[in-house]
Amino acid sequence: MIHGTKELLESAQKGGYAVGAFNTINVETTRAIIDAALEERSPVIVQMTEKTFDYAGGRAIFQYVKNVAEFYAGDVPIAIHLDHGKSFEVVERSIEIGFPSVMYDGSRKSYADNVRTMKKVVALARTRGVSVQGELGSVPYLGEISMEDVDWNEYMTDPEQAEDFVRETGVDTLAVAIGTAHGFFRERSEPDYERLSAVAKRVSLPLVLHGASDWESDRVTEVITRGISCFNVDTAVRLAFIGGLRKILDSSDETDLRKILGAARKETREAVQKKMRMFGSSGKAG
């Protein structure tokens, strides 16, 4: 059985750990993520974005991930998720394809527009038994901001507004903004831990954190204790894959693509396993 994210994250919330939601783009990254879950006996979320749909074909990549996930679903809990759906139409298409979990990202819209579209997404999802993630506050991207000059107050989740948002929309999980940014940064701002705690006090459902791919274990542990039940991981997956490719291409004249891509897959699997241990999800597959 393939899961939505709601069930996995509610279990994580009760168990005091977090589940990793790892982005895939192809055969190799999909196998790396699921192989890591099997090795670690960890629940896992395999997710895709609109850009991956454009690259690999939405239905094609979903069916591949679904086939692999179903093959191993008896061993570990696996969820498949649409990450950062930017419009109702993309979310609707993903549900039609068969995604058991979707995210509508209206974080750059006005609060009213975010709520309006989010309610439409939830209404559609409820008719199909699909889990829904919303986002309030915004997580900027590498290149979009200067870490020295950014005014984080423009991006942060407001705890009181988060309570209203969850009540008005009926989302299953909520992505929050506490001073993180997508991508790897040389200089990191300090996360607003108190803001996270304030959100968690007002919102009882599982909270998701984006933009923390390069965090070390102390920060990870801190936000889990304050309410985070899921970490999105994209940049770390890509860098591990690229690192594996560079390593074999720089050290040999190998031309067998299976060996070259296999080396990248191995490097990626090991990086994902490290994240699972950090999140505390290893051994939680039951």
Map each language-model feature to its residues.
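Extended, intrinsically disordered, low-complexity segments
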Residues: 246-286
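Generic enzyme active-site microenvironment
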Residues: 81, 133-135, 208, 275
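Generic N-terminal amphipathic, Lys/Arg-enriched alpha-helix
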Residues: 5-20, 254-255
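Glycine-rich beta-to-alpha transition loops that act as phosphate-gripper elements at the mouths
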Residues: 24, 80-86, 205-217
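Active-site-adjacent C-terminal substructures of enzyme catalytic domains
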Residues: 188-190, 195, 205, 257-265
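Hydrophobic "anchor" residues on beta-strands that sit immediately upstream
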Residues: 19, 79, 101, 131, ...
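Alpha/beta enzyme core
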Residues: 3-11, 27-52, 59-75, 84-202, ...
